[in-house]
Each structure stands twice: as C-alpha cells, then as structure tokens.
Swiss-Prot record:
GO terms for biological process: leucyl-tRNA aminoacylation. A motif ('HIGH' region) lies at residues 42-52. Its EC number is 6.1.1.4. Keywords: Aminoacyl-tRNA synthetase, ATP-binding, Cytoplasm, Ligase, Nucleotide-binding, Protein biosynthesis. Belongs to the class-I aminoacyl-tRNA synthetase family. This is Leucine--tRNA ligase. The keyword Cell membrane does not apply.
Length: 950
C-alpha cells in the first residue's frame, strides 16, 4: 500500500537504486524495433543547469515513451572535455582568481575545500563528470550508463583520429589562410564552446573604403559599399587619440582599437605616430570613388572599437547620420575652425525605393517621430530603411554604370571593382562586441596562415548535407528553413588548435583537433564504448578496426590479427552497430543549430553511407530563471542538482516539461515549481485513495458518467500519444495530467467510482515518461513489473461515446449557468425549475441547419420551410424572431445538440443537481410545464434550458 504522505526524495532514491541494480535501462540488440536517441553530452566546466535539465528531460521522456511502445531503446550519455576552457579554468582556480572563485562557490555550489583541488584539467574533468552523473541519476534519466565515456579517453582519441583520416582522404580537411575568432592569450582559434561572452557573434566582411587626407588614408568600414556614392562628410570622435600607422605601403589613420585589430590581419602594420581626433575635425577629405571633397565633423557617438574608428556619413539613407548632422546645425563648431553653415550640405540620393521619397532617412525619421540621435526609435528607423532598401531598392543614375542594379545584388559586384581600383579592402569584424574567451581575454578576428580547416563551404559537400536534411524529420518543421539557411551560409571552420585538451591530428601532431570538430559522430562511439568499458584491449585500435566496425570494410579475422581483439568480439561490435545505427532522434537546444547540429549532419554525410544518416532532429528553446537570462559564469543560475534538491525529481521534470513547447523559451519560476509540487501530491493522494477504496464494483453496469469518463480517457490517450509522437511535452502533459485531473474531479463530483481503478491503471502509464518515480511507486500496487517497461495505453475506439460526452457537457453547462445566476443574484435557492427546449425550437434549428449554406442562413428559405411545419406553424408569431437569432449564430450552429435527450438527461440527474445546490430541482419540458410562475419556459432553447430559481 502507498504511504499516507508523499515523500518525494525517499521514493525517488528507492526507484533509482532499483533501476540501477536491475539494469532496467540496459539495451542490447534483439528482434524488436530499435530506437536510438541521443542528446548533447555536457561540457565539463561547471555543474548542469536548468538549460541542460530541459533538453535532457525532453530526451528522457521521449526515450521512456518509446520504451513503453515496445521498442528497444538505446539512450546513452557521455562527457565532453576537449578544448581550452578546462585548461584555462584550472589555471584561474590555481591562481585563485577572485571572480572564478566567487562563480564556482556561490553559483555552482562547490565547497572551497573541493575547489582548491581543481587546479589541473584532469581534476576538473573528473570532478564535474562525477557531479554530472550524480545529477542525471538524481532526476531519474533512463540512461544505459555502461556506454559512458569522456572525450579525453584514449579509445575515443583513436576514434577521432580515424574520422579525421577519412575527412582528409576525401579532401574535406585542408590547410590555408582564413579569418577566425582568435584568443590572443591562448594563441588559438576559438569556437562557440570556448566563448564566455559574445558566443552569438559571427565574422562579417566589411568593406574598408580609403578616403584620402592629403597623403594619408582615412579608412571607413561599411557593410554597404554602394552608399559611398552618397557620402557628404566623415565622422571622427574628437575625444579619441588616433594612431598613425604604416599599413603595407600606405599611411593610415585609425583608432587604437582598430590598430590592434589590424595587427592580427595579413597586413604589415606598424605604428609611426599619433594624432588627436580634434585635429582632424574641420579638415577636408576626398571620396576615392566620386572625387568629392567632404568635411570631417565631430561625433562623440563614434565608437573607436567599431570598424576603423572613422565613419562615413550618408544622411540621405542613414537615419543616424541625418539626425547627427541635424543636431549640429545650430552647434558652435568654431573651436574646430568650422564656421560654414552645415545646412548647406546637400544630401545625395542614390537609391530609389518604393516606400520612400528622395531621402529615405528623412522620411523614416518623420514617419516614426524620431526626436534626435539618442531616441531609441533612431535604431528602429535605421533597420527599417536598411530592410526596405535591401529588398526593394534600386541604384540611381548617380552611381554611374551600376544604375538599375538591385541593392541586394550590388555588394559583391562593387566590392570587387573597388578592390581592383585600389580604393577598398576587406576588413573582418565581429557582428557584436565584445567577444570574450573563457580565459578572460578579449578575442579578435585573426587571419590565420597554415591553419587546418574543414571545408564546409565545399559545394558538393553542402549539396549532400541538404539532401540529408531533406530526408529527415525536423521538429518543429519551421526550423528546417533555419537549417537550410545556416548550411547555405556556412563557411570553412578552423578544426585544430595548439593548446588545450583533445586528440592530435594524426598527420600533424603539433595540432589538437578542435572541440566542436571532435563532437560530430560520437553517437557511433556509444556502440563501442560498452566493450571498451568492459575491458577490451585498446592499445592497438588501428584505423582498419574502425573501418570494419563502422563501415563494414575488411573482415573480423583481419581486424582481430591487427588489434589483438578476439574475432567474436569484433564481429559482435559490428553486429551491434548495424542494429543500432543510424540515430533515430537527436534532441538538442536551439543554440546548437548554428554549429554542433550542422557539423553533426556534415560529418555523418562525409563518413557514412546514406542508409546511416540521421533520421530526425528535435530542437527546444532556452530556460530563463525568474524572467532573467541564466549564465553559468555570471548568474543567475539554477543547477539541476539544486532544482531536484528543492523540488524533487518528478516535480522538476513535470514543471520543466510543461513549461513551454518546442523552440519557445521556458521560464523557471519557483512559485510555479511549488504549485506543481502541490499538483503532484494531489496525483499521489488520488492514487492512494483509489487503491484504498472498498466500494468499487468493476462489474457494475456502466452509468452515464462511467461512459463519459471512459470516453474521455480514450481521448486523453489519443492526445498524449499524438503529442509525444511530435515531441510536444507541454501538450502531452496538458492532456495526460492537467486535463485528466479535471476529468477525474468531474467524475468523482458526479458520483463516479466503479471505473477508478481502470482509469488509474491507464493514467499511471500515461504519466510514466514524465514522472517515473511516483508512477513506479503507484504501479507497484496496481500492476506487474516496472511501469517503465509496461505497455503504452492503446485507445479503445468502442469506448469513445460522443453521446455520453455531449450529455455530460450539457449537464455541466447547465450547472454552471445555475451557479452564475446564483452568484449574480446573490440568492440562496429554495427551489430550482429547469425547462428544456420546446419541440418547435428544435425543429426550427433542424431546418436552419438544412437550409444554411457556406455559413450563411437564408431567412426567406428558412421561414418558407418553417411555415410548412405543423409544430412551428402554431408558433408563427415567435418563429421569425427566433429565426433571426439563428441567422446571427449560424456559423456556430451544430446538429449535435439535436441528438440530446435534454429532458431525459436532466430528469435522470435531478437528484445530483438537488444535492449540488441543496434544494429541490424540478425538470419540465417548455412545451407544457405544470409550473412556470414567471414565464421562463419561453426562454428555453436547444442545448440551453431556461432556469427559474426561487
């Protein structure tokens, strides 16, 4: 029997122990249909947080669901440790960096005495691997832990070497010069996992246009080189001391920050002097494209860290330039030697766009009512003009031979021409700043020479990846367009570094394989990891071993002779791989769409035959905490361990899974979690009460409320099943938990009891993927074996009773109507009289449904038919008025109500209504009521009885 009190932690620890001892989630090949599901392995530089909780729990719920469908489910887990972050973290801990110590003691809850031990990468990996595993066990994930590994394991290193050998053979790994995100401190390229801040920043190729100031160059960075034809002035921040630098064979004037960035490019750069920005103000520069002489004006808004620190102004097409220039019209600039009237600066219109007149920037500012350059709406105006000009704009005659060219096509054409003329260069810059490495250093864009790259830009490779994507299920489907867009734009990526943890390039051992590049096909390694963990020899894992295991090349005997692994083991591993692969579902957070999930597809396409390509990807959103974005390096943060400690595993699972759907972001709120705990306790109490009841007669004839409840139960099975098939955990729980709670409340309120055990048996199985511990505890008292292995409920179509559902809906609505009248009138009823619809109104509704077409009711046709009906003819004075009412609501009319025996339903349930309201209830037909002191019977309509209360 269930205990009186729900003790979450005790129940959860009990079942976690039993599952592990009995190997309930161990998966081996057999005759069943297989389901291989994977989620991203966590990076071992901190404790698991609520973002992990959401992604991992979705994966576990789906794994449990498919297991109950009777499928053979493999749900494994491993740990990611390669790259530089862990090395950098160990150094910061060893140096007792105060920020790091605060983050890891306060946010991650690591005792100082433990943190003191984490001064080597190996210690950090070992500590967080154990913590992550404990956390995942504490929440009840149904993982086959025999297959775990860490990406620094020797066997995994051999696996990655094999993968990169194939990539190189196919020409996908090359050496060259490319712009990369670079950490000056670590002297390494950085990828998303290496970045502390600015992880969404991409590398943009700006055009540096070389304006001339005597014999010097004033380079201006722009994403829209076509606007050079409309430049009226340059902007310089007078408060910044600029550097004079020799860049190749030219002398440039740039901000100090720009100079720093230039030193990481493939240019020869040397500082030769300085010049205060204020000394540049008032001077005249020359536009290298148009030859126009333009004035340099002061602008404190110019960010020296953006571009070159010098900005070209195009007030006709850039709202911020227009506003800044307008703000200077009445300013005293005499200290810069500027005495001319800036109002005389003529705007230059160079783009024709349908939505605007000659000067789009001016029109947009006026349209949005932008006050000045500090108005937040100025940015909105800028984006609006840019978007409209990009999509609909065409260059005007002033641009010469480029006239008539659409704006969205001009950049590459013009850029190449300007480079050929020697008046422009490409300058790579981050899309957002700053970008901070996990070591704390500020990253730059560096042009790296002799760097190993993965050629993701290869057109043949791209086309194959798109082919793979086309054959996959993407959940939600609207994410497919984002995948296609990311694949189209994906460029070559640095795949090796010189520092950190990881696998060395087999042909160039000075380089370590980058941490995103080594985490692409690791799902295949889960098949092998079980044998490695069981003690298989790994010192001679040559490429031919992996060729056979994963590609079927060679023979078991050949592989055995090369590796020392016995023939039977080699053959079994190959058979296991053939059984389990490909991956049936990869579920992940949406932040990995732009990197890991793309590389996952790319590398599977490159390594494996089409039959082994992934079958489905599901993507979910982020998690915030009390409305704030979480950060494991800055806070706030809710660790998985903390969530389970405070709420219990099942409450944590239920709350996070019901919080949001698909790519919607979830918001963890502690009061919401507490409310969920109360609902889980209610579930437990209901189950205990049902188990303990001794007044249940399962052989009794089904009553109306029994038929209704069993019908609703079938619908809940159908809804929950459909939702889980579509990875919609929120919708699944709305049906399986919240709607079921409401259904049971109504069932018991109506006196239902004989089907409670039958209902509980189904309900517990519906809830098992979401709240497995409490469901195992209940199932132990009502079922056989483990609910985790119990068959998923199958709906019985013969129990779907629409008549019973309509009858109960009618009764419930009638009860609500009575309650509303009592509430409004503040009456304590002594007597309630109900009048069901008269026959003539039922017939009128029937005719209205027959003559209505396309949602419209022809009153003439209705009345013509009605007057030929004897029941209606006797009410010919009232019929037109009721017909008019029907005409207004024809779009909502349904024939279902005509199937209701309203008088019979209310008469049979008169006793129930009397008990509900504590007074006698009488039921009459409105056709001939024996008691109607206020004439209420005339108000009765189909589906809505008239109500009289004394």
């Amino acid at each position: 029997m269930l205990r009186n009190e729900y003790s979450a932690h005790e129940i959860e620890a009990k079942w976690q122990r039993i599952w592990e001892e009995e190997g309930v989630f161990h998966a081996e090949p057999d005759s069943r249909k297989k389901f291989f599901l994977t989620i991203p392995y966590p990076y071992l530089n901190g404790n698991l947080h609520a973002g992990h909780t959401r992604t991992f729990t979705i994966g576990d719920a789906i794994a449990r669901y498919h297991r109950m469908l009777g499928e053979n489910v493999l749900f494994p887990m491993a740990f990611h440790a390669t790259g530089t972050p862990i090395v950098g973290l160990s150094e910061l801990i060893a140096n007792r960096d105060p920020l790091i110590w605060d983050v890891y003691t306060r946010l991650h809850g690591i005792p100082e005495e433990e943190l003191e031990k984490l001064t080597t990468p190996e210690a950090i990996v070992d500590y967080f691997r154990k913590q992550a595993k404990l956390a995942m066990r504490s929440i009840g994930y149904s993982i086959d832990w025999r297959r775990e590994f860490t990406t620094t394991d020797p066997a995994y290193n051999r696996f990655i070497e094999w993968q990169f050998g194939i990539l190189r053979e196919k020409g996908y790994v090359t050496k060259g010069s490319h712009p990369v995100r670079w950490c000056p401190n670590d002297q390494n390229p950085v990828e998303d996992h290496d970045i502390l801040r600015g992880e969404d920043a991409t590398i943009l190729d700006f055009t540096l246009i070389k304006f001339r100031l005597d014999d010097k160059v004033l380079p201006c960075a722009t994403l829209r080189p076509e606007t050079v034809f409309g430049v009226t002035n340059l902007w310089v921040n007078p408060n910044v001391v600029h550097y004079i630098a020799r860049v190749n064979d030219e002398v440039w004037i740039v901000s100090p920050q720009a100079y720093h960035k230039l030193t990481f490019t493939d240019r020869s750069v040397k500082k030769i002097g300085e010049i205060p920005g204020e000394e540049l103000i008032g001077k005249k520069a020359r536009n290298p494209v148009t030859g126009d002489e333009i004035i340099i004006l002061p602008a404190t808004f110019v960010d020296p860290d953006s571009g070159s620190g010098i900005v070209m102004s195009v007030p006709a097409h850039a709202p911020l330039d227009y506003l800044a220039l307008r703000d200077l019209y009445d300013a005293d600039l005499s200290k810069y030697g500027i005495t001319e009237d800036l109002r005389k600066i003529k705007f230059i219109s160079l783009i024709s766009v349908p939505e605007y007149g000659e000067f789009p920037a001016v029109d947009a500012v006026n349209e949005l009512g932008v006050k000045d350059q500090n108005d937040p709406k100025a940015e909105e105006a800028t984006k609006l003009v840019y978007r409209r000009e990009f999509h609909n704009g065409v260059l005007k005659e002033i641009t010469g031979r480029y006239a008539g060219t659409p704006v969205h096509r001009i950049k590459d054409i013009l850029l190449q021409d300007l480079i050929n003329q020697g008046v422009a260069e490409i300058f790579y810059e981050f899309s957002e700043t700053p970008v901070i490495c996990r070591c704390g250093a500020r990253c730059v864009v560096k042009m790296v020479r002799d760097q190993w790259f993965l050629e993701y830009s290869d057109p043949v490779w791209k086309s194959r990846v798109l082919e793979c994507l086309a054959g996959m299920q993407i959940i939600p489907e609207e994410m497919r367009a984002e995948f296609i867009n990311k694949i189209d734009w994906l460029k070559d990526k640095a795949c090796a570094r010189r520092k950190g943890l990881g696998t060395r390039l087999p042909w160039d051992r000075e380089w370590l394989i980058e941490s995103l590049a080594d985490s692409t096909i690791y799902m295949a390694f889960y098949i092998l990891a079980k044998y490695v963990n069981a003690g298989m020899k790994i010192d001679r894992l040559v490429p031919q071993f992996f060729d056979y295991i994963f590609l079927g090349k060679g023979t078991p005997e050949e592989v055995s002779s090369l590796t020392g692994v016995d023939v039977d083991t080699v053959r079994r591993i190959r058979e296991d791989f053939e059984y389990w692969y490909p991956v049936d579902l990869r579920t992940s957070g949406k932040d990995l769409v732009a990197n890991h999930l793309l590389f996952f597809l790319y590398h599977h396409v490159a390594i494996f035959p089409e039959s082994l390509w992934p079958r489905a990807i599901a993507v979910n959103g982020f998690v915030s905490l009390e409305g704030q974005k979480m950060s494991k390096s800055r806070g706030p943060i809710l660790t998985l361990k903390q969530a389970v400690a405070e709420n219990g595993a099942d409450v944590t699972r239920l709350y996070i899974l019901a919080n949001a759907e698909y790519t919607q972001d979830a918001d963890w709120r502690n009061d919401g979690a507490q409310a969920t705990r109360g609902q889980v306790e209610r579930f437990y109490t209901l189950a205990r009460e049902i188990i303990e009841r001794n007044d249940i007669d399962e052989s009794a004839e089904l009553t109306l409320i029994d038929r209704w409840m069993l019908s609703r139960l079938q619908r809940r099975i159908i809804e929950t099943t459909d939702a889980l098939n579509n990875i919609q955990t929120r919708r699944a729980l709305q049906s399986a938990f919240y709607h079921m709670l409401n259904d049971l409340r109504w069932y018991e309120r109506r006196g239902g009891r004989n089907q409670l055990r039958r209902i509980l048996n189904v309900w517990v199985r519906l809830m098992a993927p979401f709240t497995p511990h409490i469901c195992e505890e209940i199932w132990q008292n009502i079922g056989e074996g483990y609910v985790s292995r119990a068959p998923w409920p199958v709906p019985d179509a013969s129990l779907i009773d629409e008549q019973a559902e309509r009858a109960e809906a009618y009764l419930e609505q009638t009860q609500k109507d009575i309650e509303e009248i009592i509430r409004v009138t503040k009456t304590k009823p002594r007597r309630i009289v109900l009048y069901t619809t008269p026959v003539w109104k039922r017939e009128m509704l029937r005719l209205a449904l027959e003559v209505s077409k396309g949602g419209r009711l022809d009153m003439g046709a209705l009345m013509k038919s009605a007057m030929g009906h004897p029941e209606i003819q006797s009410h010919k004075k009232d019929a037109p008025k009721y017909g008019g009412k029907l005409a207004k609501s024809v779009h909502a009319l349904s024939g279902d109500v005509l199937a209701l025996d309203e008088l019979g339903i209310l008469s049979r349930e008169r006793e129930y209504l009397s008990q509900a309201f504590g007074c006698p209830v009488e039921v009459y037909s409105a056709d001939n009521p024996p008691y109607d002191p206020k004439g209420r019977a005339q108000n009765a309509e189909p589906g809505r009885p008239a109500i009289y209360i004394e």
